[in-house]
């Protein structure tokens, strides 16, 4: 099934920190941006507890607390898709966590957007980077979740920056006759 992520820069909340979440069935990797929304950094790995039914558990409590601790203006939840844009089985998990975090923030009177960001290949990239630095996949699973969250968030931040840049008309490179000077 085709799934689509949200568009970075669309309905942008402006300057401020963003959080990125890599939702798995066992753990949720968390990353945060700097205040300028240029650089993503790992924060922590939250054990996954909340399922599809029942109340929010400690994982949702912790994620909402991190949003508040970092004064985040936007939360990006990785949407797991393949290279063709088809959703994997993990899409339901990502959407469930996004829904629960959004609901809790809204119920607390906080108008913080929770968006779904493209997650293609983020865990692969994170695993390769950690392996290259000498960390085994088994030893670094918690770190891999954080690194994947960093990849999700950094991809969003880069796309946001491009989307918000003023579009150049390139006319400044030409003289008044339309010729390139020099």
Swiss-Prot record:
Primary site of residence: cytoplasm
- Protein keywords: Cytoplasm, Hydrolase, Nuclease, Ribosome biogenesis
Give the matching InterPro entries: RNaseH-like_sf (IPR012337), YqgF (IPR005227), YqgF/RNaseH-like_dom (IPR006641), YqgF/RNaseH-like_dom_sf (IPR037027)
Q: What compartments host this protein? A: Cytoplasm
One GO term under biological process is: rRNA 5'-end processing
Which major enzyme category is it? hydrolase
Q: Does the keyword Nuclease apply?
A: yes
Read off the HAMAP family from this record. Answer: Nuclease_YqgF
Describe the family membership recorded for this protein in Swiss-Prot or TrEMBL: Belongs to the YqgF nuclease family.
User: Which protein are we looking at?
Assistant: Putative pre-16S rRNA nuclease
Instruction: Tell me which species this is from.
Output: Corynebacterium glutamicum (strain ATCC 13032 / DSM 20300 / JCM 1318 / BCRC 11384 / CCUG 27702 / LMG 3730 / NBRC 12168 / NCIMB 10025 / NRRL B-2784 / 534)
């Amino acid at each position: 099934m085709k799934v689509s992520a949200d568009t970075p820069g669309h309905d942008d909340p402006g300057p401020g920190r963003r959080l990125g979440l890599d939702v798995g069935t066992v753990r949720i990797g968390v990353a945060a941006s700097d205040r300028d929304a240029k650089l993503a950094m790992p924060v922590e790995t939250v054990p996954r507890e909340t399922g599809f039914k029942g109340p929010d558990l400690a994982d949702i409590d912790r994620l909402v607390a991190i949003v508040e601790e970092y004064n985040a203006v936007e939360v990006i939840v990785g949407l797991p898709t393949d290279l063709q844009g088809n959703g994997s089985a993990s899409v339901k998990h990502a959407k469930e966590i996004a829904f629960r975090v959004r609901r809790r923030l809204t119920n607390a009177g906080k108008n913080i957007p929770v968006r779904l960001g493209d997650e293609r290949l983020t865990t692969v990239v994170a695993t390769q980077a950690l392996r290259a630095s000498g960390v085994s996949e088994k030893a670094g699973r918690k770190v891999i979740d954080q690194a994947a969250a960093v990849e999700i968030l950094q991809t969003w931040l880069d796309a946001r920056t491009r989307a918000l840049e003023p579009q150049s008309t390139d006319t400044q490179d030409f003289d008044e006759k339309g010729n390139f000077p020099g």
